[in-house]
Structures are given as C-alpha cells and as structure tokens.
Curated annotation (Swiss-Prot):
Gene, per the UniProt record: guaA
GO cellular component, one term: cytosol
Subunit structure, interactors included: Homodimer.
Pfam families: GATase, GMP_synt_C, NAD_synthase
EC number: 6.3.5.2
Protein species of origin: Spiroplasma kunkelii
Keywords, comma-separated and alphabetical: ATP-binding, Glutamine amidotransferase, GMP biosynthesis, Ligase, Nucleotide-binding, Purine biosynthesis
Official protein name in the record: GMP synthase [glutamine-hydrolyzing]
Length: 512
C-alpha cells in the first residue's frame, strides 16, 4: 500500500513476527513485514515512520548469524529491536552478547528504570513474556539501560538517537503492557497517525482493481470459505459481470456448507458461479491413501487440474483472482532459520507456471481479522464472516487414515451435531474453532440389547486469538454429554466419543 504513514518490520525468523504486525495494525497504523536481508537501498528509498527488528532463533555471535547493515541505524527513523532484534542492536554497537547461564522462557517481572518515551504511562513493575537463551553481558556504546529483570538487561535506548531494544516480547498477550508500549513507539516516537481504516482500504482496492483489469474478465476459485468469498464480493463490486467464480465440490466439505452458502451469495450479490461436481474424482484419487501429506498434495493438484479445465472454457479471461491474505505472503518470503515444516500449507504449491492468467490478489495486504471486517463492510452476513476456520483439504484431514464415502458421511453428521449444539448453547462464537475428527479405531459398544462395533470420534474445541498458540476449550460437561449422546444415538457407525484436551503446543489444532 502506498503510504508514508507506515512501519516496516524486518523478519529474522521469529514465530511471533506476524503478531508484531497484527498489533501495529490493531493501532490502525499500516505496516509491512520484509525479510531481514532486504537490500539497504530499498529500505533507504521507502517512505516510512519507523523500523522494528523482530526476534529470531539465531545467535548474533554465530558465524552464520542473521545480521543487517549497520548503516540502517543512520537512516534517521526510529528503530525498535525485539529480543534477537535487541541483540543485533547491541552486537552492531560494540556490546557483548553471550549465552545465558540462566535462560529466560516464560513469565518474568519487568522493572522499569526510565519511564520516559518508550515506557511512558506504564507501571514501574509489570509482567512480561521472555523467550531467549542469550543476553547482553556488556552494554553497547552510547546506550543506557531503561529496564531490567531479575536475570538480565531487559530494555535499552541510545543516548542520542531514537534506537530502542527490548529483550521481552511486547507483541504477545502475556506481556500485559505490550500494546501500550507499542503504542508509545508507533505514535509518540515514530509520529504515526491512526489512518489504516477498512473503509479506505475497500475504496482504494476497488479503484486499483478497475485500473488493473480494465475490460478483461477475471476467474476466481470460490471455496465457500471466508477469504475467497470476501475476495469474490470485493472483485464483483469493482468489475461486476466481468467476474466468473468456479466452485469445485470435492465432497469433502461440512454438511450444509459450501454450495448452500454460495447459493445465498449468488442471490444476494448477483455473482456468476459455476458449480463443478467432482466428488467421485476426489474419492477415486484418494482411494487407499493414508499419509496426510499425500492427501493434501493429491487434493491440491486435482483441485487445480479441475479448476483449470473449467477456467480455460471462459472467454476473454486474462486474470485469476485469489483470496491470498497477508499471512500467506509473509510465509512465502519469511526467514525459516532452523525451524522444520510441521505440515504443508494447503494454499502452497499451487498453480502451474504456464497458466495463461495474471494474478490479482486484492486481499494480500490483510490479516484474517481485517478480512472479516472487510466482509462485514461489504455486507456479507455476520454469521458467515465469523465462522470458524476450515482446512483447505476439508474433511480429508479430519478423517485419520483412508477416506471413504461412508466415513465422510459419518463425520459430516457427527460434526454437524457438535456445531448445532454449540450454537444452541450460545458458545459457538465463544470458541475459536470446533470440529470432530474420525479415527480409524473401532470398539465394542452396546445399543439397547445389541452389540455394536463402531468408529471412535474425537470432539475438538480450542480457544485462541492468533492460532499460533491455543488452549483446549473448557466446555461444560453437560454440553459434552449431550453431544456424545446425540452422536452415538443418531450417527449409526460411531459408538464412542472422546474429547481432545491437548493444547497447541505441543499439539497442533488439526490432527493432520
């Protein structure tokens, strides 16, 4: 987005980098995440109000450490280093960083030594979140300590320039003063104004789409999820009948979702939607496959194949619309460091390079919560916009083991009961994500006087604000009892229900 009222975040591979950006956006200030090794010349020629250096998994004293050009600190814009970012500042200003004998992971008490600028309107003592194995042993030249914990220097600032460092993470909710501190940096130190508004984004996006597309046609893969649906409505608002949406019914969606939702969309927003019934093709391709990564790749490749078959039939199509959002963009350019792939993202790996379309991604600057607010502003139903996330591969990653038509039907029915009961108890909007998993495990049961031998289903519900960490939902026992009773009595083929009480980490939210 073209604006001078923005913050640039240089990413050194921290798991919390996206959180920093979200917290800045929450302050209604636009920000972008760039790789740490972005050319200094590009940074120099970019209009901005401030720079934030993220945390990261490396150590500044290692041979292959992620470092930046020291000239960055001569750009006359405020700089805030967080965790590893503070250690870089220290290292490049002749400070000493070394491995701590007593490492800090978790809650820590912060004691502020200087309540000016960065710590204005913040209590002298507060709870913060630490996550570091290294610490500053010797202060960098021309810097002073402005906060400490029991074990280490927790914050520093340059005596003349607007350069600051924090050893803790202000972006995580565990740091109670975090948002006030970021507000102090963004508004008081950098001089930003709260001008990042969804209504202004929509207006600018519509103008950009019209200018870019002209009289060409656009085709969009519409899944029925929030991102692609908001993208469709935004594109349609800009170019109307020039947009054609293609819905590929994989047969792996929730009961009463997908096409049912899109028919309402079609009616309300006058969208042109082509429906492709491809259930049999997906079942055939997935027959005998049990490995979750194989499932994801098969589904992704087949989806693209079917979509392409239909897209090339449409006249004068020059553009392919995608509901790419900012976390996808960040992931594509982020610094991975030593971290391993947990599971492949269902949006990655995608389109053939020889596809005869140009990409148009009107949501690529937005985080998920901003996409939802955009949907609301465009008139999309609140219940739809705020529905729980659903994985791209659909129920295929909620059926552990081989996928069959019978298992899909069982899972759809059980899942619908759980969702219905959450709505009935007014709890659906109180949890972040809820679903049922079908296990390849059968057990003996008794229904009336008859012995049964049925599948085991797992009920899963989590609470989270960012989906990077999550706690299992403390749902009322009475609700769980009702859900269990309804599933085993109404879904013939499932005779045992368990409740997953694993948080993230160590688990992931989805099972596959």
């Amino acid at each position: 987005m073209k604006t001078t009222n923005k913050i640039i975040i240089l990413d050194f591979g921290s798991q919390y980098t996206q959180l920093i950006a979200r917290r800045i956006r929450d302050l209604e200030v636009y920000c972008e995440v760039w790789p740490y090794n972005t050319a200094l010349e590009k940074i120099k020629t970019t209009s901005m109000k401030g720079i934030i250096l993220s945390g990261g998994p490396a150590s500044v004293y290692e041979e292959d450490a992620f470092l930046i050009d020291k000239q960055l600190f001569e750009l006359k814009v405020p700089v805030l280093g967080i965790c590893y970012g503070m250690q870089i500042i220290s290292h490049l200003h002749e400070g000493t960083v070394q491995r701590a004998t007593k490492q800090e992971f978790g809650f820590s008490e912060l004691i502020i030594d200087n309540q000016e600028d960065l710590f204005a309107n913040i209590p002298v003592k507060s709870q913060v979140w630490m996550s570091h194995a290294d610490y500053i042993e010797g202060m960098p030249t021309n810097f002073i300590q402005i906060a400490h914990s029991e074990n280490s220097i927790s914050a520093i600032k340059h005596s003349e320039k607007k350069i600051y460092g924090l050893q803790f993470h202000p972006e995580v909710t565990h740091t109670l003063i975090g948002q006030q501190l970021l507000s102090n940096f963004v508004f008081n130190i950098c001089g930003c104004q709260p001008k990042w508004k969804i209504t202004e984004f929509i207006s600018a996006a519509i103008t950009e789409i019209k200018n870019k597309v002209g009289t060409d046609n656009v085709v969009l893969a519409l899944s029925g999820g929030v991102d692609s649906s908001v993208c469709a409505v935004l594109l349609h608002k800009a170019i109307g009948k020039q947009l054609t949406c293609i819905f590929v019914d994989t047969g792996l969606l929730r009961q009463n979702s997908g096409w049912n939702d899109l028919q309402k969309f079609q009616e309300k927003f006058k969208l042109n939607i082509i429906k492709i019934n491809a259930q049999e093709r997906f079942l055939t391709a997935l027959k005998g496959v049990t490995n979750p990564e194989e499932k994801r790749k098969i589904i992704g490749n087949l989806f693209i194949e079917i979509f392409n078959e239909e897209a090339i039939k449409i006249q004068n199509v020059k553009w392919l619309g995608q509901g790419t959002i900012y976390p996808d963009v960040i992931e594509s350019v982020s610094v991975k460091g030593p971290s391993a792939t947990i599971k492949s993202h269902h949006n990655v790996g995608g389109l053939p390079k020889d596809l005869p379309f140009q990409l148009i991604e009107p949501l690529r600057e937005l985080f998920k919560d901003e996409v939802r607010r955009t949907g609301e502003a465009l008139g999309i139903d609140f219940k739809f916009v705020y529905k729980h996330p659903f994985p791209g591969p659909g129920l295929a990653v909620r059926i552990i083991g081989e996928i069959t038509a019978e298992k899909i039907a069982l899972l759809q029915a059980a899942d619908q009961i759980f969702i219905d009961e959450l709505y009935q108890a007014n709890l659906y909007d109180q949890v972040a994500q809820a679903f049922v998993v079908l296990l390849p495990v059968q057990s003996v049961g008794v229904m009336g006087d008859v012995r049964t031998y049925g599948y085991t289903a797992v009920v899963r519900s989590v609470d989270t604000t960012d989906f990077m960490t999550a706690n299992w939902s403390r749902l009322p026992f009475e609700l769980l009892e009702k859900v269990s009773a309804r599933i085993v009595s109404e879904v013939h083929g499932i005779n045992r229900i368990t409740y997953d009480i694993t948080s993230k980490p160590p688990g992931t939210i989805e099972w596959e």
